[in-house]
Amino acid sequence: MENSILLHSGNQFHPNLPLLALRPKKLSLIHGSSREQMWRIKRVKATGENSGEAASADESNDALQVTIEKSKKVLAMQQDLLQQIAERRKVVSSIKSSLANAKGTYDGGSGSLSDVDIPDVDKDYNVTVPSTAATPITDVDKNTPPAISQDFVESKREIKRDLADERAPPLSRSSITASSQISSTVSSKRTLNVPPETPKSSQETLLDVNSRKSLVDVPGKKIQSYMPSLRKESSASHVEQRNENLEGSSAEANEETEDPVNIDEKPPPLAGTNVMNIILVASECAPWSKTGGLGDVAGALPKALARRGHRVMVVAPRYDNYPEPQDSGVRKIYKVDGQDVEVTYFQAFIDGVDFVFIDSHMFRHIGNNIYGGNRVDILKRMVLFCKAAIEVPWHVPCGGVCYGDGNLVFIANDWHTALLPVYLKAYYRDNGIMNYTRSVLVIHNIAHQGRGPLEDFSYVDLPPHYMDPFKLYDPVGGEHFNIFAAGLKTADRVVTVSHGYSWELKTSQGGWGLHQIINENDWKLQGIVNGIDTKEWNPELDVHLQSDGYMNYSLDTLQTGKPQCKAALQKELGLPVRDDVPLIGFIGRLDPQKGVDLIAEAVPWMMGQDVQLVMLGTGRRDLEQMLRQFECQHNDKIRGWVGFSVKTSHRITAGADILLMPSRFEPCGLNQLYAMKYGTIPVVHAVGGLRDTVQPFDPFNESGLGWTFSRAEASQLIHALGNCLLTYREYKKSWEGIQTRCMTQDLSWDNAAQNYEEVLIAAKYQW
């Protein structure tokens, strides 16, 4: 025993028992070495007595010092490897495409990885590794590597938790030996393998340093055995095969890490392979120009389509010196009524959409009255607008690149741009140009059709044989010129702004003389309910509610924010500030179509109900005068604002308790959507889009979003409004429930944009 020293075990899995280690004078293990040539470690009984068989004190101290130095080196190496593991994990996690298929295979003989996981280090495993498969090495150091440190075990626990989610692919293995000099260099791509377990005898275990498995992190299923069973694999061919496998695994890992991976890679567009170039053409576009819902649609729908991955442009007239659009430098000349008219294109890129404005002396200085002038003047403006708009994809280099006519779809809106599908066919398709360009015509209000005498055909500058699509027979006025009729016949697809309105258009009452054409083209007609711009119309973000006593609010702060906005509105308009009085609002065009006359008939009844009424709008002169008269007669209860103000419309929507929309017909309607977003309850005539968007309140099931009436009569309006006021005063919980349902709806344009996309795809593949 003179060549033995007494050591204390540092293994965390076993008690601190002294170990008696045999120190041979010289040990060289080669292929075919016997078991006697291995180091032998025997457990000895721990006694507090000095052993005569132990080495001298000096030899023990020297051996212990050498062991400590070795331990420090191995610990340092382990810490370095753990740091490299963390760095490698970041790289692996960024390789998204390889994570799903990150499965290795593990074979105990060949060293491959299969169905294994990080072993459970909480079990009481013995970390000694016996093996009869001797790897040829020489000059083995006299001291045994220490057991795995606590830091290493803790790090493995962390790695196991991380890999459960990451499912990282197997990495290259590195051999760690306890030779006199650590000859292997650990690269940044190598990681650690947990040493497997060996069957233990009651008194002794064998440790073959050279047969330790390389330390590698492996994902997968739970390991079946912490140690591979002992094998008698000593052939040189097996060792060579194993080395080749290790080199191959390392090369594959190197290739994976060297491949550049873009961490910020964008996901594919929502439109998938159906991404198109879309140009929406409208006579108005919010916030630059707006008289109704058409301007809102032109300002919001393109942004939703752009979010789906399409390249989108909006083309509108430049009625004023807008600050955002800049002169593109492109100028063109078009003939209108035999005269040359020069146009200039102004361009801006906002929220992923190209906005192009056509500037001409025919559009300038019209101001708010964008449809002003006589019938012929309006027709000439629209002829110029459509001629210039259809050539925008060729002439205006948005972002440095023109749209071109490939994979292109035009979206025309109402009669103002109904000439566009006609020009597309007459000027281009009939001449073999833009054969794959499609057009979709959207009906916002079929009551306005661009009607006139047949002589107006001379202004549109078309070949004589195109006269027939414009002809329409009216039982009252006889045969006449109709632009909307020609657009409906030549467009590839037709869209209405609600499902209810698409049904009404097919009737003689709702089709306004065009119902026969619509029924003949029913196969290409589809109704799509409008959405709203949830950035502009959002009580939490509304910039118009950030001053003058108003405040932004959400569903959580509705009970405090909305009363404050109501008080601020009453104060701003000079009405008595009373929280208990229902405040009723109306926002819209002063026109019989909007049911303003029904409100006028119901005003005497309203004034007897202790309510306040605020009306905002412009339109017919007699109805504007009626508004002023109501304010004079009921100065403490009614306010009439003749004109239109975006700020005031937002504040009325936020401050009012109830919104009236008694329209005789309403293709879609947006004000009821704005009102519901702000927790203002709508009372509407159940027509068109109002029927689609406002579900009647059901007090028995606590469902519904407002009140509706079926006939355009003052008595019907009074009945619905009376039930609404009763609920407001007597059933607060039901009222708050209606507000909650209104405010939690998804009213964004995203759903509508997806439906529009389906229509555009159908037009694209139409032959």
UniProtKB/Swiss-Prot annotation:
GO terms for cellular component: amyloplast; chloroplast. CDD domains: GT5_Glycogen_synthase_DULL1-like (cd03791). It is an enzyme of class 2 (transferase). Keywords: Amyloplast, Chloroplast, Glycosyltransferase, Plastid, Starch biosynthesis, Transferase, Transit peptide. Its main location: plastid. Residues 160-204, 226-268 are annotated as: Disordered. ADP-alpha-D-glucose binds at K290. May be the main starch synthase responsible for the incorporation of phosphorylated precursors into growing alpha-1,4-glucans. One of its GO terms (molecular function) is alpha-1,4-glucan glucosyltransferase (UDP-glucose donor) activity. Residues 172-188 have a biased composition (Low complexity). Residues 253-262 have a biased composition (Acidic residues). Residues 230-245 have a biased composition (Basic and acidic residues). Belongs to the glycosyltransferase 1 family. Bacterial/plant glycogen synthase subfamily. Accounts for only 10 to 15% of the total soluble starch synthase activity in tubers. This is Granule-bound starch synthase 2, chloroplastic/amyloplastic. It catalyses: [(1->4)-alpha-D-glucosyl](n) + ADP-alpha-D-glucose = [(1->4)-alpha-D-glucosyl](n+1) + ADP + H(+). Residues 1-45 form a transit peptide. SUPFAM superfamilies: UDP-Glycosyltransferase/glycogen phosphorylase.
